[in-house]
Amino acid sequence: METLLLDGETLTLEQVRAVATGAARAALAPAARERVRRSRALVDARLEDGEAHYGINTGFGTLAEVRIPRADLERLQRNLVLSHAAGVGAPLPLAEARALVLLRANVLAKGVSGIRERTLELLLAMLERGVVPVVPERGSVGASGDLAPLAHLALVLIGDGEAFLAPPGAAAPPERLPGGEALRRAGLEPVVLQPKEGLALVNGTQAMAAVGTLALLRAERLAALADLAGAMTLEGLLGSHRPFAPEIQAARGQPGQIEAAAHLRALLAGSELNASHQGPGCHKVQDPYSLRCMPQVHGAARDGIGFCRGVLAREVNAATDNPLVFPDTGEIVSGGNFHGQPVALALDVLAVAASHLAAISERRVEQLVNPSLSGLPPFLAPQHGLNSGFMIAQVTSAALVSENKVLCHPASVDSIPSSAGREDHVSMGMTAALKARQVVENVRTCLAIELLVAAQALDLRAPLRPAQRVADAHARLRERVPHLSEDRALYRDIEAVSRLVDEGALEL
């Protein structure tokens, strides 16, 4: 198993997914270890200068004017974690929670947070031994960072809160335990937080970045899968390949469109179905937009998803706590890197971009099940009337598309003041992340429905064969889901194709 060396500078989004899913380990890079030590030494030195340093020997937020006696500084950090652990709702899934731990460790490895090496090593040991904090999804407004989610992470470090014990690769299901017990069972000991450490742990954008990164990576795969689903539908509807010609795309010059069209051309190469309706007997002039404009719509989605990638690729290596500790200059400086606006905006774009993959997919499903548009039996049903076929599968897709329209209302245009007005503009970045995650989940299901319905259409076009890559995907789908010869409970089929999507089994 690969071991990633965290330095706060070079972590990639794919590496985040690898650690989150247990496919890679993480350790502290030697150069980062030295930076962490120097940063901590500066914090310790400043404790002796008699000056007020925010969050080190003062209260927090609107309580920043309160000086804390030296004897109470450890208690101050513990109280910060305890008081801020006020999240509610379902816990983050294990992969997202592991991504959260990784991102916080990576940011601390930059050496500008004042954390002790021992505390950072405990975070990494938790990842290694499968101690995954129970982190409620809700309670963050995205500035000062994701305070509540990160406080729930920090609780486990001090032997409080709750954690799942889920060693990577273990066959047993995760066990939910008190945080201290989870550490003990994993052979780890909690830490007593020193000045600045509580603040270094809870102040940052890592929760929204963790959820957003995994949603983004899933959306990227779905953007490619949307081309496959669309190609399968096009074949089932005897649609034209001509709108995907490279000269059409070059005349506009949008990169995502060019990429999507090239993928569609590759998927559709060598199609018998396409050749069958190119002669003088074919009276179709133009296909509906949901077929003809796939490069434009899928391409725009790719471009929006790509914008989000750029933001998150920077954010996973970003120092976002406050204050920041700069040992080279000897300064400890308060700023606003904890504000999640860049991430919130990007995740709103991700949700909107991905939603269009589902919206156009649902319209293609309508083309398939509508006999006046497809020339196939109504709802692709055998003995229609007695059987309803895929009638309600299309309705399910429509329901998810409409749900996405609600979810795509941008979180980042909202703000609500908190902390007695000191935190008077916030990003709602975690809300944007959770919405984007659900939108992407809905897109996956809509594409699974399209693949299921399009496969039925291809069956009905036999003996003509589709393009080889479409035929290969059709064959893999049929290994799990048989042809619909009479009505059955379609939720099982939708779930089976959704699992194929999740496994990447249809990626060609």
Swiss-Prot record:
Record's subcellular location: Cytoplasm
* Record's comment on post-translational modification: Contains an active site 4-methylidene-imidazol-5-one (MIO), which is formed autocatalytically by cyclization and dehydration of residues Ala-Ser-Gly.
Q: Which residues form a coiled coil?
A: none
What catalytic activity does the UniProt entry give for this protein? Answer: L-histidine = trans-urocanate + NH4(+)
Full protein name: Histidine ammonia-lyase
Arranged from A to Z, the UniProt key words for this protein are: Cytoplasm, Histidine metabolism, Lyase
- Homology family: Belongs to the PAL/histidase family.
Tell me where the cross-link 5-imidazolinone (Ala-Gly) is found. 143-145
| Pathway connected to this protein | Amino-acid degradation; L-histidine degradation into L-glutamate; N-formimidoyl-L-glutamate from L-histidine: step 1/3
Q: Which GO terms describe its cellular component?
A: cytoplasm
One of the entry's Gene Ontology molecular-function terms is:
histidine ammonia-lyase activity
Q: What SUPFAM superfamilies does the record point to?
A: L-aspartase-like
Point out residues bearing the modification 2,3-didehydroalanine (Ser).
144
Specify the taxonomic lineage: Bacteria, Pseudomonadati, Myxococcota, Myxococcia, Myxococcales
Gene coding for it: hutH
At the top level, the lineage of the source is Bacteria
> InterPro entries annotated for this entry?
Aromatic_Lyase (IPR001106), Fumarase/histidase_N (IPR024083), HutH (IPR005921), L-Aspartase-like (IPR008948), Phe/His_NH3-lyase_AS (IPR022313)
Task: Kindly give the PROSITE patterns that the UniProt entry links to this protein.
Answer: PAL_HISTIDASE
Pfam annotation, one family: Lyase_aromatic
Q: Which GO terms describe its biological process?
A: L-histidine catabolic process to glutamate and formamide; L-histidine catabolic process to glutamate and formate
Give the Enzyme Commission number. Answer: 4.3.1.3
Major subcellular site: cytoplasm
| Class of the enzyme per the UniProt entry, highest EC level | lyase
